[in-house]
Amino acid sequence: MEEARKRHGNPKLRASDIEMNELFVAVKDYHLEPYATQNLMDFCMNHQLSMTNLLLLGIRTYLSKVNNGQEDITIQNFISRRSTHDEWTSGGSRTIMFPCRTVISPETDFLSAAYEIQNMQNRIYMHSNYDPALIVDEMRKRYHTPEHTSYESCYLTYQPMPVKVENEMLGTIRQHAKWFANGAATKKMYLTVSHTEDGGMNFSYHYQTAHLEEHDMELLYYYMMRILFKGIAEPDMSIGEIMEQV
């Protein structure tokens, strides 16, 4: 962002340039064990939270930690994918994503922060048929940001579909799914979280190699897990304390 402020001559600019030249994307997957996954699922069930919102809290807390405690964090959350039969072979599909912006102080306890994100998401879902492209245009007009800039660098998709075969005749056939990058993307970091056959979860990080390395994804996953499991173990602990202890 500091580089973008210098480039555009605006010391108060709240947006960074989107990489438009070197668009190569790499993928790094991490597998979360079934027992640990079940702990997250149980926490969500017991506190009436969605897994998406818990994951958003983990990402935003990490971003806050590495940005000097920044309280104002926005993450783009994909809320639906729509595809037609023709799109199966066209190389694309229609996706709908919305920015989830929350301002959470370090004094806020973990559970309250999760509910704050959930309340924000519930308000967003009411407008899930709104064109994301129009949102981008409106943000640019409202905040007077230059073209091809963005405040968001992280994107999330959670796929709540357990990988199980209901047909007992096919139950012994093992299944395996893996995400592959198409080689180019304008999104800095795109995380897809899905369930695995053994009851665990797969965290698939797609990242632009122009500015990010595999080690960056390793750190993101490591601290996300530290934050989430610290939070569900001690939901009354403040976000600030969690950031200090992890």
Protein language model features and the residues they cover:
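Extended, hydrophobic beta-loop-alpha segments that form or line the acyl/peptidyl-thioester binding
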Residues: 71-78, 110-112, 181-245
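Short amphipathic alpha-helical segments
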Residues: 51-60
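Active-site catalytic microenvironments for nucleophilic, acid-base chemistry
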Residues: 61-66, 101, 227-230
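Aromatic/hydrophobic pocket-lining residues that form π-stacking "cages" and hydrophobic walls in ligand
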Residues: 40
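Generic structural detector for well-ordered beta-strands
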Residues: 29-31, 101-103, 192
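Short amphipathic alpha-helices and their capping loops
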Residues: 1-28, 35
